[in-house]
Each structure stands twice: as C-alpha cells, then as structure tokens.
Amino acid sequence: MTDETYMRRALELAEKGAGWVSPNPLVGAVIVKDEEIIGEGYHERYGQLHAERNALAHCTKSPKGATIYVTLEPCCHHGKQPPCTDALLAAGIRRVVIGSKDPNPLVHGKGIRILREHGVEVTEHVLEKECDAENEVFFHYMQTKLPFVILKYAMTLDGKIATYTGASRWVTGEAARAHVHRMRNRYRAIMVGVGTVLADDPMLTCRLKETENGANPVRIICDSKLRTPLESQIVRSAKEIPTILATCNRQEAMHMPYIEAGCKILVTPEKDGHVDLSDLMQQLGQLGIDSVILEGGGTLNWSALQAGIVQKVQAYVASKLFGGTEAKTPVEGQGFHTLSLIHISEP
C-alpha cells in the first residue's frame, strides 16, 4: 500500500477525536512494519495521550524500524503531555510520514528538525490539503487567537429560511438535522440572536444517537438589550450547560438574575444598535473558545458577514418552495452594494 493509503487511515482515526480534544488539534497515527499495520492511535481527549503515544501503546509487535504515519507534525515541547518526538526516538521509529506542519510556534518545523537530526527519515506533505482541512479550526485559532466561525443555515430552493409568518420547522429533513448535531459536537460553541430565543425557545444542545457520544457546545446569545427571558430553556439550564449572554447593556443590576441562573455575561461596545461581533470574537478567543457555529437569523447573519468574522458557510437546501416577498432569507440587512466586495473561496 502507498503512503497516501496509510495517511487516509490516520485521517479516519483523527476524526474520532472531534468534539473531545478542543482546543487541541485532531491527530491520527498509524504504525506500519513490513507492510503490516502494527499499531493505531488518535488523540482521544484533551490533556490525554497524543496520537503517536497511543499508537505506540497499541503496537502488536516491536515498533523498532517501523514507519509511523501521522496527520500533524509530532510535538517537541512539554505541555500536558511530554514530547512525542522523544517517544518516537525511544521506540526506534525509522521513518515518519507527516501530513501537516504544526502551526504552533512551539513546534512549527522543530519536531521535524529534531527527528532528522537523530537520523530519522521524514517525509512531509502527504495528503497535506486533506490534513490541513481536518484541522482548519486549530490552524485558524493558532494563527489568529480568534474563533473559527461557520455560518450555518437551512433554506428552501427559493432561498427562504422561514415563511412570511416566521414558521421554520422543519425546512430540512432528518438527515440534515442529524448532520447539524454532529457539527454541534465538533464545534466549541453555538451562537444565535435573541430573536431566535424569543421565537423558538431552543435548547441548542447536541442530540446524537445513543451509539454516539455527544458533547454540548457552549451556548452564546447575542442580546444587546438583555431581552432573553429568564424562564427560557437556555437560561433555566445554564448551570448544566455553559451559557454566555453577549450584550451592550452595562447595567449590572440587570446582569445579576442571569448570573445567578448560571449564565456568563460578556459586555461589548454597541455597533449599529447591536453587539459588536468583532469585539465579541476577541473576548471568546481569550476564553479559549476556538470555534463557533452561527445559527442566527438573517439580521445576525448579515452583521456577521459585514463584520468579517465568518470563515465558512454551510448551507442545507431543501426541495421546498416558500415564496413570498416577506418570507425570511438567510442574509438580510442592507446587503453588499457591489460584487467586488464579495470574496468566496471554495474548499
């Protein structure tokens, strides 16, 4: 089998850590000796063994002289775990095949250099594009210290997210909704506007099948004037599921009922009557929140695009037609006045 074949297996393993290792990267590793896979591993939980050490621990025979395929450059510094380069050298690994170079300045090329200095053959850039995509959140956060924001919405064939009366359940079917819950498991936080809370009273939790493990995202409500009802499901469950209210309201007396209910309050400057989303992203990044699913209505979505905080758009299109000039669309507001302001890159 080829290097690409083994690296694809390492990518499959890396994916198993989705939702559990943030803010660490997703990493998978496969150890091969005499064209036989003798060990596999992935980074399973934040703070626990890295993929390389897990793969070494699961070897069915001595890894001395073997090749390890790892989706991300092995670390070479002491964090919650010791350097993986040390483990690979101690195990006698002969060759290391790497997908992505680690953007962490504590590593970035240093792990590769250490291995080569000790006589280990290193092959880089194998399925690099796929490995980079697997860790797009980690790469973005490591380079900017801002959350990676994905704008998600479901719409009809004629581009509507709700009827003119506001009815929106359900635009899409079960398959799309199941995919959304897998996204919620993968991303660190989910953000909506207060209008969504007032209209739908959602829980914004991760509901996966019993056979899957689901981690609830941090819930963020953009509520400039603090109109979120104290009796809403989100506020009532805030002591069990981390919940943030982002507001422009600086009156501490109005903050207290939410704080007592378990919510965290983040105050931003006001921008056009709304929460300053750029400032909010700075604060979320400082809290270690590396990724956000934006499930807002048309107004919040437009504000996010206008603020330039969105890195990716995920659209689900249903085979339905709502019609109506008053029906809600995914992006409202004034809109861009010229095509030259619109820049979209395809994956």
Give the residues covered by each predicted segment.
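Short capping loops/turns at secondary-structure boundaries
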Residues: 104, 108, 124-127, 142-146, ...
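A short, flexible N-terminal coil/short beta segment enriched in small residues
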Residues: 10-14, 23, 34-41, 130-143, ...
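Short beta-strand scaffold segments in enzyme catalytic cores
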Residues: 27-33, 153-154
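Enzymes that bind and transform nitrogen-containing heteroaromatic metabolites
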Residues: 3-8, 13-17, 22-24, 80, ...
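A broad detector of short, well-ordered amphipathic alpha-helices
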Residues: 8, 12-15, 39, 50-53, ...
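Zn2+-dependent cytidine deaminase-like catalytic core
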Residues: 31-130, 218, 244, 249-251, ...
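Proteins enriched for Cys/Gly/acidic motifs involved in redox and nucleic-acid/cofactor modification
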Residues: 20-23, 48, 112, 126-154
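Structured loop/turn residues at beta-strand edges in well-structured enzyme cores
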Residues: 61-64, 91, 144, 185, ...
